[in-house]
Structures are given as structure tokens and as C-alpha cells.
Amino acid sequence: MPHAALAGARGSLWWTDCLDLLARVPDGAARLVVADPPYAVAKAEWDEFDSLDAYVDWCDRWLAEVHRALAPDGTAYVCGFSEILAEVKARSGRRFAGGVRWLVWSYRNKANLGGDWGRSHESILHLRKARRFVMNVDAVRIPYNDHTRRYPERVQAVSSQYGGGVRRDRWEPHPLGAKPRDVLDIPTLCNGMTEKTDHPTQKPEELVRRLVLASSDADDLVVDPFCGSGTTLVVADRLGRRWLGGDADPAYVGMARRRLLATM
């Protein structure tokens, strides 16, 4: 039975599982879903599944609900390890008529304590319900590289695609920076960082902030069916979005509640 843990001016937090939470979203009401589900790597009791097929079947069930809940121009981000998300994409990606873009979250501040290639990235599927979808490029522009900063103006070749079909004698960098790329270089959270909680798979606020800025507008509804420590909800509230989140673990719901109370 779902339990309301917190109700705020912009949204509500629930102790419930993902399917129950998504069922609360009317058809087409969510502009954005950010999902950081269990990775099926047995990191904790809630991360254990009988088999990879069982995990993919489960993901397909809640992604069907995500598709229903999304607005016609809405999208969803799903976090995970590449080897697992490849299976999820193959099964569930076909639901999304706008296609699936594969993003990479890259971090360089995690020590390699094993005897193999050290993991320094995770993947994020960007699932688009339709070909026309919200993408606020200017909100998530990034700094230009060293070469562009050193030589900010240059002659534009006749064949250049940078002008969007408009011929210009010279190209100048955009004042807000370069367009975003599909590799996001953001440090992972480490002990001692202010935002760090006891959640084992907590995502950095900066990572989620970019996703929310890129794929939603002010007052849009942002949904997180695996809210964990509440990062998506905290970021959404700060950015003026409405939000709905839940988690099946009461300890994590408590973490999220405390963070939201400190933010709201």
C-alpha cells in the first residue's frame, strides 16, 4: 500500500514501488522521467534478480508505464551499466517512436581497486516518445575546447554545416558555449562532498541538473520512480519544476524527505 511521505508546493514523495508510483501519473502528464533503477549487479538486496531476462522483463513493464505517462513531446532518461542497458534498449527501445540516444556519464575521480580495467563511466538511455521532443540546447551548452578559445573567429568553409544553411564569411563561437555532447564529464560523488548521502548509487546533482534543464521547462512535471536519496526531486524543485517521486525502500524515502525539507 503506497504511503505519502511528503507533500510540498511543487510535488509529493511516496514510499511505494515504481509501478504504483507511475500509475499515479495521468496519461501524457509528465514531460520528463528520470529513472535510476537497480542495475541487476547484486549491489544490495534490492538489486538482485533471478536472471538478466527477468530484469529486462521487469524493466519492460515499468517502461511501458513510462511511455504512457509521458507527454507527446516528453522523454525519459534511464541510467545503468552499458552491458545491462544494451539488453533493455533492445527490448524496450522500440516502444519509443522518437528513438533512443545513448549518453555516457564519464568520471575520472574513482579509484581502480581491482585487477581489471577500472570502470570510469555509466550509460544513460535517452528515450524519446516522438520525433519532436523538448531539447533545450542553450540551457546545457558547455565550454569550448582550448583551440576554439584560442582562435575564436575563423573563416567558414562553403561546405560548413555550422551556419545552419546560412553562408557567413566568418564563424564566431556562441556566447553561451558549445552545443552539448553525448559524453558528460562530471565527477562521481565521494566521501566528504557536501551532497553525499549513504545511498550506494547516488547521482551527482550536476548530472541530473543537466538532464532536467535539457528536457523540461519551468512548471513541467518531472517524475522519478526510483528516487533513492531524492536527487532528481531536489534538483527539480530548485529549477521550478513540479515533481513526483517514490522509492520502495523506506530508508531511502527518509533520506529524500530530509533533503527535500532542506530545499523546499
Which functions belong to the PLM regions below?
Residues 1-255:
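Core catalytic lobe of class I
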Residues 214, 259-262:
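Active-site catalytic microenvironments for nucleophilic, acid-base chemistry
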Residues 252, 261-264:
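Conserved phosphoryl-transfer catalytic core
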